[in-house]
C-alpha cells in the first residue's frame, strides 16, 4: 500500500510538471496595458513583468517619473492586442496577486528585454527569480553605453557614492536606514550610481539615491 502511494505521488508530481510545461507554450491575448511593466490578459490575469522596473506613472494628478509615459506607450505598441507567451520563474505571483512572468511575443522577442534595451526600464533582481538576470543586465549595459531613455537623465550625476546589498541587489545612500543594516559579508561599496546600475543593482525606494537632494 505504501509503495502504491509513493508511485501515485510521483505520477502526480510528473503530471503537474507536464501541465506547467504546456502552460509555458500557451499564448494569451493582452487586452489592456496599465503602464510600462504591467498588462491585463483576456483571461483576467494581471501580469507584472519579471526582472525589470519602468518609471512610475502618477495616477493622482502629480508629476510622473521621467520617461514613464514613453515606457507605457512602447509597451502598448509591443503588447496591446498581441498574443503573448508567459514564462515563469520560481515565484508565480507577488504579494498583490499579480502573475510574475517573462513575456514573449510570437516572434520570440521578450518584452521585458526590449524595454530594458530601449532604456525604458532598469533591471530589478528579486530572489529567487533570477533566471534571465544576465540577459537583462546585458541589455541594460548596452542602453547605458548609448545613454538612451532613462539613462540620458538618470546618470547625469555619476559621482555620488552609494552602498549595495549583495543579498537584495539594492543600492542605498550611505545614510539610509537600510544601508546601515547591511551585514559586512553582503556590503559592497560603489563609487557612483553609474557603477551600481552597471552591476545590476536597483535603487532603494526609501532613500531614493537617484534623486538629487
Locate predicted features.
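Small beta-barrel nucleic-acid-binding modules, primarily SNase/OB-fold domains
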Residues: 2-213
Amino acid at each position: 500500500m505504501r509503495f502504491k502511494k509513493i508511485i501515485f505521488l510521483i505520477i502526480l508530481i510528473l503530471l503537474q510538471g507536464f501541465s506547467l510545461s504546456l502552460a509555458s507554450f500557451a499564448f494569451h491575448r493582452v487586452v489592456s496595458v496599465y503602464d510600462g511593466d504591467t498588462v491585463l490578459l483576456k483571461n483576467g490575469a494581471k501580469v507584472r513583468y519579471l526582472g525589470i522596473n519602468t518609471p512610475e506613472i502618477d495616477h493622482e494628478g502629480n508629476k510622473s517619473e521621467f520617461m514613464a509615459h514613453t515606457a507605457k506607450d512602447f509597451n502598448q505598441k509591443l503588447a496591446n492586442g498581441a498574443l503573448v507567451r508567459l514564462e515563469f520563474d520560481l515565484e508565480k505571483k507577488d504579494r498583490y496577486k499579480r502573475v510574475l512572468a517573462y513575456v514573449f511575443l510570437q516572434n520570440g522577442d521578450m518584452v521585458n528585454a526590449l524595454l530594458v534595451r530601449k532604456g525604458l526600464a532598469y533591471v530589478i533582481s528579486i530572489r529567487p527569480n533570477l533566471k534571465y538576470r544576465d540577459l537583462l543586465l546585458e541589455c541594460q549595459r548596452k542602453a547605458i553605453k548609448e545613454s538612451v531613455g532613462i539613462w540620458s537623465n538618470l546618470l547625469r550625476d555619476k559621482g555620488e557614492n552609494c552602498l549595495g546589498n549583495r543579498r537584495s541587489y539594492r543600492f542605498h545612500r550611505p545614510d539610509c536606514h537600510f544601508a546601515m543594516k547591511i551585514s559586512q559579508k553582503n556590503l559592497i561599496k560603489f563609487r557612483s550610481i553609474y557603477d551600481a546600475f552597471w552591476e545590476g543593482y536597483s535603487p532603494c525606494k526609501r532613500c531614493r539615491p537617484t534623486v538629487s537632494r
